[in-house]
Structures are given as C-alpha cells and as structure tokens.
C-alpha cells in the first residue's frame, strides 16, 4: 500500500486535541473521516505530535497508507474538500517510503508560543495568543531561557500524567523575541515532554514580570519537582510549526513525542 506524508494546518480551538477521544471531535478524526471517503476503507493515521485541546499547528505531519496511488495535489485537494467546514487543511501531500513514520522518524520538532503583552483585550488574536497585561521584559526572559537549553532532567516542566519513560530531554533552542506588543517564544528539540513547552513559557513569564530571576528558574529546573514550576501557559498561544526528518544517511529519530 502506498504511503503518503501529509502536512497539516489546523485551528486547535475547534478540537479536543490531535488524538481521537470520546469526549469530542479531534483533528485525527476529521482527517481519518476524509480518508475513508476517498479511500473506500478505513485508514488510520499517525501524527508527529499529539497536540492538546486548543493547541494549533501550521505544520503538523502525519502519514497514511492508502489503497492506491494518488497524484499529490489531487490527494491534497480531495482531502480538503471532504474536511470542510472543519478548520483543518492539508497543505501538502507527498509519497514516502513505507519505512517513513511521521512520529518515530522525526529528528526535531519546532514550537512557537505567542504572547500579546498589552492592557487591551484581544479581538483578532482571541484564542490564538496568551494575553498578559503586566509588562514583560522579553530580554530578561530570553537570557533566562538559556538556562533551560541543553540536556537536562525536565521533571519540573512535565505534566503529572506525562507518559514518557524518562524526563531527560535535550532542548536545542529556546529563544524569546519581542516585536511591539507581540512576544514570540520558539523552542526546538528532538522530542518534548507533555506540557513541557507551556510549562517553560509559564515560568519564563514569571521572569519577565520580575517575580523570578534567572537563578530562580535554574533552581526550579534543578529541583526536578513539578511543584517548583510556574503556571502552565494557556494552550491558545501554542503552535506546532515544523517537524524535521533525516536526509538520506542520517540517523532516524528514536524518541517518541508525547506532547507540548
């Protein structure tokens, strides 16, 4: 059966998350329903990241095995036609070897977190960013964020229900940049623990507001204690923006991705 890689964009506010659940509509269910319509038989998909309710994606990746070959642009358009009016779009489809796995072949995930730092309420950005009314020092946040880069035990920044066997992760990038009222936080790693990005953002907000120093953030990390974490930032500001895969000859990813 030919395998296809799907690059998917969605507004997470409409869904209970990526993964199928009994308590509401998921992104996975929308795509699998569309695949059933064009394939004539049920198709299960696997995504690179199991994003939570309210978390968005501009470049989630999934793979699917279909009954016949499709021209990539025709497959993309057919899926999008069957998914309307759900706020999900396949932005690209391409054939891949049967050894490709959207989740386990990935070598890097990229996340963006968006904070709007102003007193006025959100209008166009409602549900798509975290509104923080107290003034934040983005430079202090960026400098403190470098404490978290590298290989660490991130127990402080993982959800209690995290399924990962180990809390050890290597954070390749954690950058904070302000453009006007918008503060963007970008994180990259091979894999993340459940709620890791949102937990780190919530703690960086404590630094930006002056409640914590970089030393306080380091102490929280080294405590390896969930109770030392700042608040978990709201899901609405988080976006899965990219997933990297190895070029031919590179080592494939081995760590599963559990969440953001």
Swiss-Prot record:
Substrate binds at residue 111. It comes from the Bacteria. The active site is at residue 52. The keyword Isomerase applies. One of its GO terms (biological process) is tRNA pseudouridine synthesis. Keywords: Isomerase, tRNA processing. Gene3D superfamilies: Pseudouridine synthase I, catalytic domain, C-terminal subdomain (3.30.70.660), Pseudouridine synthase I, catalytic domain, N-terminal subdomain (3.30.70.580). One of its GO terms (molecular function) is tRNA pseudouridine(38-40) synthase activity. InterPro entries: PsdUridine_synth_cat_dom_sf, PsdUridine_synth_TruA, PsdUridine_synth_TruA_a/b_dom, PsdUridine_synth_TruA_C, TruA/RsuA/RluB/E/F_N. Its EC number is 5.4.99.12. It catalyses: uridine(38/39/40) in tRNA = pseudouridine(38/39/40) in tRNA. Homodimer. Belongs to the tRNA pseudouridine synthase TruA family. Formation of pseudouridine at positions 38, 39 and 40 in the anticodon stem and loop of transfer RNAs. This is tRNA pseudouridine synthase A.
